[in-house]
């Protein structure tokens, strides 16, 4: 729901706007934590290490994406504050077009560099194959990570920080359920963890 941040108490507006944002970011970090916790129940040290290293890489990439997406929030918020609907629409359209291209390029680059990235992370030999499998699947899901963050940035620019929180909360619940399915029932190991994460991120966009 769009919230008018230009009226009422400044501190109250900041608090009610920032709290859902902080919770959203916290929930986003739970993806890797949930993968680690669940794989530890079904796999050995190699599988757990693979997910641990893969989660670190994905967290770094997510932080970069979130940082880039913040520019969208600022641009749209300025246009909304100025009551310039055309500029707000223009910013939204340009952002979607730009990041659509960026997501595909970034996905291809990361897929080509997946093995060097695993080596740079000083991955133990026994965990290399699992880490490569985990990151390969997660990298395929990069467009959905970018899409979620861009959509969330647009909502926040419009003054709505609650909707992105609801999106990611549903995705986190789905991730946990899918992790137990893929790792517990189907015994897919690190690949199962990555599948759960990627599919739940897709759900957060849909």
Predicted regions and their residues:
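Alpha-helical transmembrane segments of multi-pass membrane transporters/permeases
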Residues: 99, 154-177, 195-198
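Short alpha-helical transmembrane segments in multi-pass integral membrane proteins
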Residues: 1-18, 76-141, 185-206
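Helix-loop interface residues and adjacent transmembrane-helix termini in multi-pass membrane transporters
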Residues: 30-33, 41-45, 79-82, 157-158, ...
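Small-residue-rich hydrophobic transmembrane alpha-helices
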Residues: 48-108, 145-164
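Residue-level signal for short hydrophobic patches within transmembrane helices
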Residues: 7, 11-30, 34, 57-64, ...
């Amino acid at each position: 729901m769009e919230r008018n941040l230009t009226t009422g108490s400044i501190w109250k507006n900041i608090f009610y706007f920032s709290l859902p944002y902080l919770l959203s970011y916290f929930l986003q970090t739970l993806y890797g934590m949930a993968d680690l916790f669940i794989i530890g129940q079904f796999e050995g040290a190699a599988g757990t290490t693979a997910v641990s290293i893969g989660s670190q890489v994905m967290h770094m990439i997510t932080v970069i994406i979130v940082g880039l997406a913040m520019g969208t929030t600022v641009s749209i918020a300025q246009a909304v504050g100025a009551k310039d609907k055309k500029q707000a629409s223009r910013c939204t359209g340009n952002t979607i077009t730009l990041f659509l291209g960026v997501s595909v390029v970034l996905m291809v680059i990361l897929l080509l560099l997946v093995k060097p990235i695993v080596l740079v992370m000083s991955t133990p030999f026994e965990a290399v194959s699992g880490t490569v499998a985990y990151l390969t699947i997660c990298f395929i899901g990069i467009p959905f990570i970018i899409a979620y963050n861009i959509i969330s940035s647009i909502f926040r620019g419009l003054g709505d920080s609650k909707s992105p929180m609801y999106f990611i909360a549903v995705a986190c619940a789905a991730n946990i359920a899918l992790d137990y399915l893929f790792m517990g029932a189907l015994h897919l190991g690190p690949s199962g963890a990555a599948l759960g994460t990627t599919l739940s991120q897709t759900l957060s966009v849909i």
